[in-house]
Amino acid sequence: MSTYFGVYIPTSKAGCFEGSVSQCIGSIAAVNIKPSNPASGSASVASGSPSGSAASVQTGNADDGSAATKYEDPDYPPDSPLWLIFTEKSKALDILRHYKEARLREFPNLEQAESYVQFGFESIEALKRFCKAKPESKPIPIISGSGYKSSPTSTDNSCSSSPTGNGSGFIIPLGSNSSMSNLLLSDSPTSSPSSSSNVIANGRQQQMQQQQQQQPQQPDVSGEGPPFRAPTKQELVEFRKQIEGGHIDRVKRIIWENPRFLISSGDTPTSLKEGCRYNAMHICAQVNKARIAQLLLKTISDREFTQLYVGKKGSGKMCAALNISLLDYYLNMPDKGRGETPLHFAAKNGHVAMVEVLVSYPECKSLRNHEGKEPKEIICLRNANATHVTIKKLELLLYDPHFVPVLRSQSNTLPPKVGQPFSPKDPPNLQHKADDYEGLSVDLAISALAGPMSREKAMNFYRRWKTPPRVSNNVMSPLAGSPFSSPVKVTPSKSIFDRSAGNSSPVHSGRRVLFSPLAEATSSPKPTKNVPNGTNECEHNNNNVKPVYPLEFPATPIRKMKPDLFMAYRNNNSFDSPSLADDSQILDMSLSRSLNASLNDSFRERHIKNTDIEKGLEVVGRQLARQEQLEWREYWDFLDSFLDIGTTEGLARLEAYFLEKTEQQADKSETVWNFAHLHQYFDSMAGEQQQQLRKDKNEAAGATSPSAGVMTPYTCVEKSLQVFAKRITKTLINKIGNMVSINDTLLCELKRLKSLIVSFKDDARFISVDFSKVHSRIAHLVASYVTHSQEVSVAMRLQLLQMLRSLRQLLADERGREQHLGCVCASLLLMLEQAPTSAVHLPDTLKTEELCCAAWETEQCCACLWDANLSRKTSRRKRTKSLRAAAVVQSQGQLQDTSGSTGSSALHASLGVGSTSLGASRVVASASKDAWRRQQSDDEDYDSDEQVIFFDCTNVTLPYGSSSEDEENFRTPPQSLSPGISMDLEPRYELFIFGNEPTKRDLDVLNALSNVDIDKETLPHVYAWKTAMESYSCAEMNLFPSPRNVKVQKPEPWYSGTSSSHNSQPLLHPKRLLATPKLNAVVSGRRGSGPLTAPVTPRLARTPSAASIQVASETNGESVGTAVTPASPILSFAALTAATQSFQTPLNKVRGLFSQYRDQRSYNEGDTPLGNRN
């Protein structure tokens, strides 16, 4: 078995290695080369680059040391791999001595050795991966008439697809500075050496000899192998099925894993059907997969995709040229059968969406097929069931369609504007150059567009969208009808005085005579003014000071007839006249009617544009498109696409978006729920252990556990009770005459005492303490302090006894906390009555554990319950935990029984709690008066300093260790229904567009869906989202923050322009807009830091069709939101005026915010140090 030794030399800056007989002694090429021919030694035909470019003439290698040039055998050119393949290892090692970067490897056959010499280590990995060797790369001695020879690596095989060379559709000539517009397409198989352009000929590229001679250098031959293999026929069939099935995610993953699914070895589209040579775009046009077609066109236009295909050796110019070539191929390449382009396929099948995608690219051409027909001539030829609407739309798309866009600057340096109508063949200019600075330009982006439509209709739509209609005579504008503004100025026509008398009616002629200054000037001579200094000539020097005459209105006949009427109309006090005062009711009625009609398109559109810069133009354009029954597309950053979100397709995309977010939240919370289950398991095990310890006190007390660190439990409890006893004694002494205050204070102290006792009972270190004697012990301590107090007189003692008797009688039949108070009062009364006869010692003498135990043994036990649930804070916390556990069980389901687990029953007991809806980990409470009335509690107090929320837990099964006897019933004074107490458990909706809280983008989508009915069955997520959004008030919606920290995504262009448009920045605004009256726009970076009561700002309805406006009115220092009614047109207009004028600058916004916040609180003069000032 023969062995071959291959030497791999990486490509250097000087170029690739070229073999010769003197350098590669002993190689296969050196041994088998033919003898040199001196006659032909003057020049040698050197191989060009492996990219298949035209061969170039090179001189011999200067390293040979002889004047004679080397001889090149056609079978063994200098770049043949056989120059570096040896049969003797010693000969191969000689090459390694001269080239330090060379690598040597042994192979069992010549085929693998050639692959290694050409492509290095990657070829070996490819052989192992695909189980086949690289084909041979031998020269093809085909000599054309011009004397050029094909490159040895220019054969069309699966391994000749080096992105830097073989068969590249476009290549920028070296040293060429011509723009990409100079790249021409040609059908000739060869190119002239003097040509200055690139020619595509049979999928191969050739360099120009003239450029080679002007800038001679070594050919850029890549020694690296192709980074991607050619897909097999079975893989191409599977790829075609994925396209036909509409699996866009799978298609995207396939083409980015291996670009060869879209680009063949000749840098042309890959044929997915060999017979008729259908590429991916033909398949999409046949089955109407517009989204996949948009993805493919966007991908082949992406510089990163071609760079991935080309590799690291490819330049930016090469990638740009390849993008242009591929885009032109995919849009305009005809099939082999009928010579039809993808546009023909989409037009004859009646696929409107596919035609829209294709014609949106300016590179798409309307070519003729073999029958000489263009796509517009075969509309719906293969679709007999096409509707008339479909045919009309296709005709509109194929016959010069026009669109009206919204242009926004990507850096927010320019306000948005309505762009001029354009067609795909003539796209708009997205480079806005400043007038003052010619070198500066601003990049614009299309954020929405309406169309397609005819050019005439597009111009009308553009004028209507850009300039709202003026208010007519019969519809009164709020500015014109308001007494606070001047009359509407009407500019007369310039040609009004040029009309002849015969061309106008007598009425019009009379009006011109009465109201025309020209008529007055021609009918009467103009009086001569008296000029000072007795001269009519004007001196043209600085010494002449001309007096300033008062403003004179032009004299007209009607103004001469009634001069007072004109001035009275403009007098500010004109409304104070008796005549107008008598007609005040008529004025109010007229203004009311005008106000209802004044919310017309003109006023609403201007208000929306000025107040909502982010989406104002889109709101107006969307409504106009619906009125004109035109298609509307709008870019939504969270969907990263242009679409009308109110259509069926848009709602489906929104539903899919919410569904995806739901799945993501479920995946993220899965680990959290698992940890929650584990914690509940540990809690249940701890509860069982504590129960076992309570059953056997003696054994648990003697146990030496790590938690038993307190050796004096009675001393600790005694010291704590002494603190409470001192506070109770102080309260009794200071408030001896106020029984109500003493009752409330004792209730609060006993509530805290219960919390302390519960914590002691939950701790295993205090198991030996008998807590049933707590009331007797604390009464004993209070009696001791009262008896030994010097402040307590005999009269106070008698008064205290009388008060305790009254409290005991009142609290005899009470339960809960009042029962505890009655028990303490009874014990305290008994101690104080027996104090003169019995010895009551001070507790300071109890300093040891033995003395404390002896003192506790003398106390009496009581029947009061010391359950943990009687503590409000503890019970609330445990109830909340139980409700959250119920939500966990509802969302995750019951856990399976695990055999052999010690605490399995306890685990299921802790997890098997009631049911609630998904997402109820955070709950909100809604007021329910009936539920509050049904609650009867024995330990419920509502403190003003603490917001306490209780839930109705009657339908929820609590976990083990929780008691439902007393915590289900609460009671508060019936005369005050507290909103914080009257609550029902409801799940909080937390699925919004950009997180758990609504943003301005949610409001924008809600405006777009305001007139759309959402089906709860088919669109459950959208229905839930819209219901949650509609629950917010207008004041809360004004406080929604703008989406600032949004992931930057590249928007899908609605059309594909030149290569520069593909690298444009996304449409998301990196800067915050400060021209909308939103609280988040006033203070950047703050979230929810505004006042508790938001200032109610006047705000128009969410859509132009609505006319509800809220106005904030001040009444007794409180902000009250009132709805505008027709009876108060002046107030409503003032509010609208304030809405349009108050938010001018960020500083004014902040000032207005804080001033409204301060006005909401009514200060008393006695509360401030400045109250006594005059």
Curated annotation (Swiss-Prot):
Residues 37-74, 141-230, 519-543, 961-981 are annotated as: Disordered. SUPFAM superfamilies: Ankyrin repeat. Residues 37-56, 150-164, 174-198, 205-219, 533-543 have a biased composition (Low complexity). Keywords: ANK repeat, Cell cycle, Cell division, Cytoplasm, Endoplasmic reticulum, Neurogenesis, Nucleus. InterPro entries: ANKLE2_3rd, Ankyrin_rpt, Ankyrin_rpt-contain_sf. Changing residue 326 to H: Pupal lethality at temperatures above 22 degrees Celsius. Larvae initially have normal brain sizes, but later in the third larval stage, the brain is smaller than in wild-type counterparts. GO terms for molecular function: protein phosphatase 2A binding. Involved in brain development probably by regulating asymmetric division of neuroblasts. Regulates neuroblast asymmetric cell division by controlling asymmetric protein localization of Mira, Baz, Par-6 and aPKC, and spindle alignment. Also, regulates the localization of kinase Ball during mitosis, specifically maintaining Ball in the nucleus during interphase. Required for proper ER and nuclear envelope morphology in neuroblasts. This is Ankyrin repeat and LEM domain-containing protein 2 homolog. It comes from Drosophila melanogaster. The gene is Ankle2.
